[in-house]
Amino acid sequence: TSAEDGAIFGAMGGGSMRYKTGSYADVKGYNLAMGFGKAVANNAGRLTFGPFIEYGKGEYTSHLDGGIRGDGNTKYYGVGVLARQDNNSGVYYEGSLRYGRMDSDYASGDLINFADNRVQTSYDSSSAYYGAHLGIGKVTELNDTTKADVYAKLLYTHQNGDSVTLQGEGNGEVYDFDAVDSTRARVGARVSKAYSERGTGYVGLAYEYEFDGEARATVLGFSTPSPSIQGSSGLLELGYILQPKGVNDPTINIGLQGWGGKKQGVTGNVNFVWKF
Protein backbone atom coordinates (compact mmCIF):
# COMPACT_ATOMS: atom_id res chain seq x y z
CA THR A 1 0.00 0.00 0.00
CA SER A 2 1.01 3.63 -0.42
CA ALA A 3 -0.30 6.83 1.15
CA GLU A 4 -2.22 9.31 -0.95
CA ASP A 5 -3.76 12.73 -0.36
CA GLY A 6 -5.75 13.79 2.66
CA ALA A 7 -8.96 15.76 2.37
CA ILE A 8 -11.33 17.87 4.42
CA PHE A 9 -14.98 17.19 3.66
CA GLY A 10 -18.19 18.86 4.71
CA ALA A 11 -21.92 18.62 4.15
CA MET A 12 -24.78 21.04 4.74
CA GLY A 13 -28.40 20.05 4.26
CA GLY A 14 -31.90 21.14 5.10
CA GLY A 15 -35.51 20.87 4.12
CA SER A 16 -39.13 20.39 5.01
CA MET A 17 -40.55 16.89 5.49
CA ARG A 18 -43.81 15.24 6.52
CA TYR A 19 -43.63 11.85 8.25
CA LYS A 20 -46.87 9.85 8.04
CA THR A 21 -47.02 7.98 11.35
CA GLY A 22 -50.63 6.84 11.47
CA SER A 23 -51.12 10.50 12.18
CA TYR A 24 -48.37 12.77 10.84
CA ALA A 25 -45.52 15.07 11.83
CA ASP A 26 -44.11 18.05 9.92
CA VAL A 27 -40.40 18.69 10.40
CA LYS A 28 -38.24 21.57 9.19
CA GLY A 29 -34.54 21.68 9.92
CA TYR A 30 -30.93 21.62 8.85
CA ASN A 31 -27.85 19.49 9.48
CA LEU A 32 -24.11 19.97 9.24
CA ALA A 33 -21.17 17.57 9.14
CA MET A 34 -17.43 18.07 8.75
CA GLY A 35 -14.54 15.67 8.82
CA PHE A 36 -11.08 14.68 7.72
CA GLY A 37 -10.32 11.84 5.33
CA LYS A 38 -7.19 9.98 4.32
CA ALA A 39 -6.91 7.96 1.12
CA VAL A 40 -4.59 4.94 0.88
CA ALA A 41 -3.97 3.02 -2.35
CA ASN A 42 -4.12 -0.78 -2.17
CA ASN A 43 -4.04 -3.70 -4.60
CA ALA A 44 -7.80 -3.55 -5.23
CA GLY A 45 -8.09 0.22 -5.56
CA ARG A 46 -8.29 2.90 -2.89
CA LEU A 47 -9.44 3.02 0.74
CA THR A 48 -10.67 6.32 2.19
CA PHE A 49 -11.37 6.69 5.92
CA GLY A 50 -11.59 9.32 8.62
CA PRO A 51 -13.48 10.88 11.56
CA PHE A 52 -16.27 13.47 11.42
CA ILE A 53 -18.49 15.61 13.65
CA GLU A 54 -22.20 16.24 13.06
CA TYR A 55 -24.87 18.68 14.22
CA GLY A 56 -28.51 19.17 13.38
CA LYS A 57 -31.39 21.36 14.51
CA GLY A 58 -35.07 21.39 13.66
CA GLU A 59 -38.60 22.22 14.66
CA TYR A 60 -41.62 19.96 14.37
CA THR A 61 -45.40 19.90 14.63
CA SER A 62 -47.15 16.60 15.30
CA HIS A 63 -50.83 15.86 14.68
CA LEU A 64 -52.41 12.77 16.24
CA ASP A 65 -55.63 11.25 14.93
CA GLY A 66 -57.45 12.27 18.12
CA GLY A 67 -56.92 15.95 17.32
CA ILE A 68 -53.91 16.46 19.60
CA ARG A 69 -51.37 18.90 18.19
CA GLY A 70 -47.90 19.31 19.65
CA ASP A 71 -44.98 21.57 18.76
CA GLY A 72 -41.34 21.27 19.64
CA ASN A 73 -37.69 21.68 18.81
CA THR A 74 -34.94 19.14 18.53
CA LYS A 75 -31.18 19.18 18.07
CA TYR A 76 -28.43 16.58 17.95
CA TYR A 77 -24.65 16.62 18.07
CA GLY A 78 -22.25 13.74 17.69
CA VAL A 79 -19.08 12.20 16.31
CA GLY A 80 -18.42 9.38 13.90
CA VAL A 81 -16.03 7.52 11.63
CA LEU A 82 -16.48 6.43 8.03
CA ALA A 83 -14.67 4.29 5.49
CA ARG A 84 -15.05 3.53 1.79
CA GLN A 85 -13.21 1.13 -0.48
CA ASP A 86 -13.31 1.98 -4.21
CA ASN A 87 -12.12 -0.94 -6.31
CA ASN A 88 -10.61 -0.54 -9.77
CA SER A 89 -13.50 -2.64 -11.13
CA GLY A 90 -16.01 0.07 -10.17
CA VAL A 91 -17.37 -1.86 -7.17
CA TYR A 92 -17.29 0.02 -3.86
CA TYR A 93 -18.08 -0.72 -0.21
CA GLU A 94 -18.77 1.85 2.50
CA GLY A 95 -19.68 2.03 6.16
CA SER A 96 -19.94 4.42 9.09
CA LEU A 97 -20.45 4.52 12.87
CA ARG A 98 -21.99 7.45 14.78
CA TYR A 99 -22.58 8.37 18.42
CA GLY A 100 -24.07 11.48 19.97
CA ARG A 101 -26.83 13.11 21.98
CA MET A 102 -30.29 14.37 21.05
CA ASP A 103 -32.14 17.08 22.99
CA SER A 104 -35.79 17.91 22.36
CA ASP A 105 -38.75 19.74 23.85
CA TYR A 106 -42.49 19.39 23.33
CA ALA A 107 -45.53 21.54 24.12
CA SER A 108 -49.24 20.98 23.54
CA GLY A 109 -52.49 22.58 24.60
CA ASP A 110 -54.57 19.58 23.53
CA LEU A 111 -53.78 16.90 26.09
CA ILE A 112 -56.82 15.61 27.99
CA ASN A 113 -56.74 15.46 31.81
CA PHE A 114 -58.77 13.17 34.09
CA ALA A 115 -61.64 15.70 34.09
CA ASP A 116 -61.80 15.38 30.30
CA ASN A 117 -60.54 18.95 29.78
CA ARG A 118 -57.82 20.06 27.38
CA VAL A 119 -54.76 21.32 29.26
CA GLN A 120 -51.47 23.03 28.39
CA THR A 121 -48.42 20.93 29.12
CA SER A 122 -44.79 20.49 28.03
CA TYR A 123 -41.64 18.48 28.65
CA ASP A 124 -37.91 18.41 27.87
CA SER A 125 -36.04 15.27 26.88
CA SER A 126 -32.39 14.30 26.35
CA SER A 127 -30.97 10.94 25.33
CA ALA A 128 -28.01 9.35 23.59
CA TYR A 129 -28.09 7.93 20.07
CA TYR A 130 -25.86 5.70 18.01
CA GLY A 131 -26.02 4.50 14.45
CA ALA A 132 -24.30 2.66 11.65
CA HIS A 133 -24.63 2.14 7.93
CA LEU A 134 -23.30 -0.30 5.35
CA GLY A 135 -23.40 0.12 1.61
CA ILE A 136 -22.32 -1.57 -1.60
CA GLY A 137 -22.48 -0.30 -5.14
CA LYS A 138 -21.01 -0.43 -8.63
CA VAL A 139 -20.12 2.44 -10.93
CA THR A 140 -20.29 1.52 -14.63
CA GLU A 141 -19.11 3.72 -17.51
CA LEU A 142 -21.88 3.81 -20.12
CA ASN A 143 -19.82 5.94 -22.52
CA ASP A 144 -17.06 8.56 -22.41
CA THR A 145 -19.17 11.09 -20.49
CA THR A 146 -21.89 9.04 -18.75
CA LYS A 147 -21.72 6.79 -15.68
CA ALA A 148 -24.31 4.72 -13.80
CA ASP A 149 -24.06 4.07 -10.05
CA VAL A 150 -26.29 1.24 -8.73
CA TYR A 151 -26.23 0.81 -4.95
CA ALA A 152 -27.83 -0.72 -1.86
CA LYS A 153 -27.57 0.60 1.71
CA LEU A 154 -28.66 -0.53 5.16
CA LEU A 155 -29.00 2.26 7.75
CA TYR A 156 -29.58 1.77 11.49
CA THR A 157 -30.15 4.30 14.27
CA HIS A 158 -30.91 3.71 17.96
CA GLN A 159 -32.10 6.42 20.33
CA ASN A 160 -32.13 5.63 24.04
CA GLY A 161 -35.31 5.95 26.06
CA ASP A 162 -35.98 8.69 28.60
CA SER A 163 -38.36 9.47 31.47
CA VAL A 164 -39.85 12.96 31.36
CA THR A 165 -42.06 14.83 33.82
CA LEU A 166 -44.88 16.87 32.32
CA GLN A 167 -44.78 20.57 33.17
CA GLY A 168 -47.58 23.14 33.22
CA GLU A 169 -51.03 21.65 33.77
CA GLY A 170 -49.70 18.16 33.12
CA ASN A 171 -49.67 17.76 36.89
CA GLY A 172 -46.25 16.14 37.13
CA GLU A 173 -47.19 12.96 35.30
CA VAL A 174 -44.18 10.91 34.20
CA TYR A 175 -43.92 9.64 30.62
CA ASP A 176 -41.52 6.73 30.12
CA PHE A 177 -40.30 6.67 26.53
CA ASP A 178 -38.91 3.40 25.21
CA ALA A 179 -35.81 3.36 23.07
CA VAL A 180 -36.50 3.88 19.35
CA ASP A 181 -34.83 1.77 16.67
CA SER A 182 -34.86 2.70 13.01
CA THR A 183 -33.70 0.21 10.37
CA ARG A 184 -33.89 1.34 6.75
CA ALA A 185 -32.96 -0.43 3.52
CA ARG A 186 -32.40 1.69 0.42
CA VAL A 187 -31.75 0.59 -3.16
CA GLY A 188 -31.23 3.05 -5.96
CA ALA A 189 -29.44 4.18 -9.09
CA ARG A 190 -27.86 7.45 -10.17
CA VAL A 191 -26.84 8.41 -13.71
CA SER A 192 -24.27 11.18 -14.13
CA LYS A 193 -23.15 12.97 -17.28
CA ALA A 194 -20.10 15.20 -17.67
CA TYR A 195 -20.96 18.36 -19.62
CA SER A 196 -17.46 19.85 -19.46
CA GLU A 197 -14.13 19.26 -17.74
CA ARG A 198 -15.50 20.88 -14.58
CA GLY A 199 -19.26 20.27 -14.64
CA THR A 200 -21.22 17.02 -14.12
CA GLY A 201 -24.98 16.72 -13.73
CA TYR A 202 -26.78 13.74 -12.22
CA VAL A 203 -30.26 12.33 -11.67
CA GLY A 204 -31.21 9.46 -9.39
CA LEU A 205 -34.08 7.29 -8.16
CA ALA A 206 -34.24 5.22 -4.96
CA TYR A 207 -36.66 3.10 -2.95
CA GLU A 208 -36.45 3.04 0.85
CA TYR A 209 -38.21 0.79 3.36
CA GLU A 210 -38.35 1.49 7.10
CA PHE A 211 -38.66 -1.77 9.06
CA ASP A 212 -39.34 -0.31 12.51
CA GLY A 213 -39.25 3.32 13.65
CA GLU A 214 -41.97 2.91 16.31
CA ALA A 215 -41.88 5.35 19.26
CA ARG A 216 -43.51 3.80 22.34
CA ALA A 217 -44.36 5.50 25.65
CA THR A 218 -46.14 4.53 28.88
CA VAL A 219 -47.94 6.65 31.47
CA LEU A 220 -48.86 5.19 34.87
CA GLY A 221 -47.98 1.80 33.43
CA PHE A 222 -50.40 2.11 30.50
CA SER A 223 -49.17 2.21 26.92
CA THR A 224 -49.94 5.33 24.86
CA PRO A 225 -50.64 5.37 21.08
CA SER A 226 -47.38 4.58 19.27
CA PRO A 227 -46.53 6.52 16.11
CA SER A 228 -44.52 4.52 13.58
CA ILE A 229 -42.88 5.40 10.28
CA GLN A 230 -42.70 1.77 9.13
CA GLY A 231 -43.29 1.58 5.39
CA SER A 232 -42.09 2.61 1.94
CA SER A 233 -40.77 5.88 0.55
CA GLY A 234 -39.47 6.93 -2.86
CA LEU A 235 -36.67 9.38 -3.65
CA LEU A 236 -35.97 11.46 -6.77
CA GLU A 237 -32.74 13.45 -6.80
CA LEU A 238 -31.13 16.01 -9.11
CA GLY A 239 -27.72 17.54 -8.72
CA TYR A 240 -24.63 19.17 -10.16
CA ILE A 241 -20.98 18.58 -9.30
CA LEU A 242 -18.43 21.34 -9.90
CA GLN A 243 -14.86 20.12 -10.15
CA PRO A 244 -12.00 22.30 -8.84
CA LYS A 245 -10.62 24.96 -11.14
CA GLY A 246 -7.31 25.26 -9.33
CA VAL A 247 -5.17 22.87 -7.31
CA ASN A 248 -6.40 24.28 -3.99
CA ASP A 249 -10.09 24.58 -4.92
CA PRO A 250 -12.75 22.22 -3.51
CA THR A 251 -15.08 19.88 -5.36
CA ILE A 252 -18.65 21.09 -4.75
CA ASN A 253 -21.81 18.96 -5.02
CA ILE A 254 -25.20 20.71 -5.01
CA GLY A 255 -28.24 18.43 -4.76
CA LEU A 256 -32.03 18.57 -4.49
CA GLN A 257 -34.16 15.62 -3.30
CA GLY A 258 -37.91 14.99 -3.44
CA TRP A 259 -39.57 12.33 -1.28
CA GLY A 260 -42.93 10.55 -1.53
CA GLY A 261 -44.64 7.80 0.49
CA LYS A 262 -44.21 7.52 4.26
CA LYS A 263 -41.78 10.42 4.01
CA GLN A 264 -42.94 13.37 1.92
CA GLY A 265 -41.14 16.62 1.22
CA VAL A 266 -38.15 18.35 -0.28
CA THR A 267 -34.56 18.52 0.95
CA GLY A 268 -31.40 20.07 -0.42
CA ASN A 269 -27.69 19.74 0.25
CA VAL A 270 -24.31 21.29 -0.51
CA ASN A 271 -21.27 19.03 -0.05
CA PHE A 272 -17.61 19.85 -0.57
CA VAL A 273 -14.31 17.95 -0.63
CA TRP A 274 -11.05 19.91 -0.36
CA LYS A 275 -7.98 17.80 -1.11
CA PHE A 276 -4.50 18.74 0.03
Region roles according to the model:
Residues 138, 148, 153-161:
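Solvent-exposed flexible segments
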